[in-house]
Structures are given as structure tokens and as C-alpha cells.
Amino acid sequence: MTRQSPSRADASRPPRADASRPVPPRFVRPGAGVVKVGTWHVGTPARQRAAVEAIARAWRRRARPGGGPLSYHVHTSNDGTRLLHYSQWTGEDAYRDFVRTARDGRNAEIDAAVPGIERQGLRSYELYRSRRTDGDGREPGCVVVVEIDFDGPDPERRRAWVDAVFAAIGSDPQAHPGGISAHFHLATDGPRVLNYAEWESERAHREALEAPGDGVGSATEQWERVRNHRGLTGSRVTRWTPALSLGAGVLDRRV
């Protein structure tokens, strides 16, 4: 069950003034039962750009599959080597129908344009909690994906950790102003939490990491509870730039 923050994270997002740029995901979306997140390794910035263009062509020239996705967002890694895919579906059955009837043709066209793509690590998630300040109209220049692993799949432990993060954010006396939003997802197929965090820029996120304390967040008791939460085994941080968004009945939007 998705928990919305008191700010109703997506209801406050104003219409975009610049339709040439990708639309951020609508995280709290009616009917979205599962989120798929995966990466492709492409190797170079030039191949990143070519792959994004190939994805846009492959999807634009075909009818949208009846079962979805509800939305599909592609990001380029800031190190120039990978793509991140974030898609929303009504459920696993809708995704399986897409794989059975529509995925291979699209992938074949993309692979013909950019040979040698390595498709890695597609996982299923459910959105648990989102946070965005009411009326904050800033657009993300950088998406920070934080993957947090636990020593077991217990969903209650993972929810408790996310709740602790929200308490720490809400009480932080020196939160970096460059953070825009945070959207926490629980893996349905393993012991992981994924935070899709929107920031003004990569520089803003780096400044937050370099501030006093251990990572993003001040040296408070609440953040200490987050960092020492029972069952944590490790985490990984990657930075991405929004590149392409596709949705039902919506023209693609590209950088």
C-alpha cells in the first residue's frame, strides 16, 4: 500500500512550461501496481544518446500496448555509460503481457541501432512513501538513485527504516536546499529499498554529501538511527539525468 506524504507529493507539481524536456514520473499514480527499474550498459556518452533516440523511435512508431506501461522514463548516467529505466504498470500480469507480445520487436529495433547493449538488473518495486513540498515547482537537473540492501526481505523492517528517514528529514536543522523530492520504493522480489530522489543539480547533491556528517543529512540523533538501523547491509548511490519520458496518450518528451 502506497503511503503519500502530507505534502501530496505529485498533486503540488505545477504544469511544465517547457514541453521539450522530459516529464518527471507521476509517482502517486492511480492504477499503478508495480514499478519496474532496470539498467542498460551502453559504454559511452555517444552510445547513450544513440540508444535514447532509438528507444524514442521504437516506441513512437508502434501503437502503445493495451496493458501498458502507464509511464516509461529513461535516464542517462552521469558517468556516460548506462541508461536507467523507470516504468509504471498496473501489475505483473500487464508487464508479462508486454514481454509476450510487444517487447521483442522494440528491443530488436533498438539493438540494430546500438548493437551490444547489456541489459542488467530489472527489478520490481512498489512505491511506499513520497515527499515533496507543496508548491515546489523546481525541475530536477539530477536524479539520485539510492539502493539500500537489508539482510532479509522483511517488509516491516524496510518500512520502519523509510519511516525513520522521513523523521530525520523532517527534523534536520540544516537540510540542503538543493533536494527537491524523495520517493521510496520497496522491492517485491528481494530485500531492497530504492530511493528515487530529485535534486536541482549534481553539484547540489555533491555539496550535501560533503557537508559535515556522514552522507546526506546532519549529525542528528534521528539520522544516526537511520544509519545504524537493524538489518542494513549496504547501499549504493548513482546519479542520472532525465532523458526521455513516454506515457499513455502523451507524446514523447526529450532533452
Regions found by a protein language model. Give the residues of each.
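Short S/T/G/P-rich N-terminal loop/turn motif that feeds into the first structured element of a domain
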Residues: M1-L83, T90-V255
